[in-house]
Regions:
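Short, surface-exposed, charged/polar-biased interaction segments
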Residues: 28-31, 35-42, 49, 77-80, ...
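Glutamate identity and glutamate-enriched acidic tracts
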Residues: 20, 30, 48, 53, ...
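Short amphipathic alpha-helical segments at helix-loop
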Residues: 6, 41-44
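Long, hydrophobic N-terminal alpha-helical segment
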Residues: 1-36
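Amphipathic coiled-coil alpha-helices
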Residues: 17, 24, 31, 38, ...
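Glycine-rich, aromatic-bearing surface loops/beta-hairpins
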Residues: 64-117
Length: 117
């Protein structure tokens, strides 16, 4: 379980890994698009796809090792189990947010997101 302060600290601390994930995601998408066409890319071939996929999984494993729930990678969506007013919640960070500014009850999901006040 995370407090809001702990979730915010982890996002700030892990921002370099999150940025790495975003870069890998972009490289992988570009490489796969190139290889789907004429089959050539300045970024490489199938071996480079496999290497990027391995790097992507490594970053995801790192995030998961902190008990962070990675809900999406395009965009990156991270949930941190916590408690608010006696209820189980997920502190929610979405790619582009400067901080953990949202939460939702576990049973409500993303559609139930509310701003942290």
């Amino acid at each position: 379980m995370f407090t809001l302060a702990q979730a915010r600290y982890l996002v700030a601390t892990l921002q370099p890994r999150i940025d790495e994930l975003i870069g890998i995601r972009a490289d992988l998408a570009e490489l796969q698009a190139d290889l789907a066409g004429p089959g050539m890319s300045a970024l490489g071939g199938r071996a480079e796809v496999k290497a990027l996929e391995a790097r992507l999984h490594g970053v995801l494993e790192d995030l998961n090792s902190h008990d962070i729930q990675v809900k999406g990678i395009a965009p990156v969506l991270l949930d941190f189990p916590g408690e608010r007013e006696g209820r189980a919640v997920l502190w929610c960070w979405l790619e582009g947010d400067s901080d953990v500014r949202w939460y939702h009850r576990v049973e409500c999901g993303f559609a139930g997101r509310r701003p942290v006040r």
